[in-house]
Amino acid sequence: MSFLSCEEMLAAARSQNISLSEAILRSDLAESRLTEAHSREMMHHLWQVMQATSRDYDPAQRSRSGLSGGDAAKVEQAHQEGKSLGGDYLAAVTAEALKTAECNACMKRIVAAPTAGSCGVLPAVLLPLARSGEADEESICDALYVLSLIHISEPTR
């Protein structure tokens, strides 16, 4: 993307009277030579991978070292038993972050955004929003465009 900061992209979106996600999409299309349909298809695929990582979580699976695995299920169980701090959303975010990290450690699906160390952050925030009905798939994909700007501009700040 030709924008080096979120501030620049926000200014561009405001000046064109379009959403931030639309401005990011347009910038990406101008640089990538992708069609809008293909770009959106790729975002939907990323979202589907995040969903599959959660859906296919196996609490019995362990990493090769045996150090990682099963913790997301423990968090979910503690919440169901009323032993967790925070509300439903915080418990869901915590469990989803662990599911993704454990899936990465077990070499199933790799969700690296922007690195494997932060792999669970995006799915952790987005999956509970989608499940609660607070965000539909298009809104999630728009959020992924915005998050891509943050990822791209962060190293330059």
Predicted segment positions?
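Active-site-adjacent structural elements in folded domains
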Residues: 107-110, 157
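Alpha-helical support elements that line or immediately flank enzyme active sites
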Residues: 123-134
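Glycine- and small hydrophobic-enriched segments that form the cores of compact globular domains
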Residues: 85, 115-119, 131
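Generic N-terminal targeting/processing segments that precede catalytic cores or assembly contacts
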Residues: 1-108, 132
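Beta-strand segments within the central parallel beta-sheet cores of soluble alpha/beta enzyme folds
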Residues: 136-148
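Conserved phosphate/anionic-ligand binding catalytic regions in large, soluble enzymes, centered on
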Residues: 110-125
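Residue-level detector of conserved catalytic or cofactor/ligand-binding positions
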Residues: 150-156
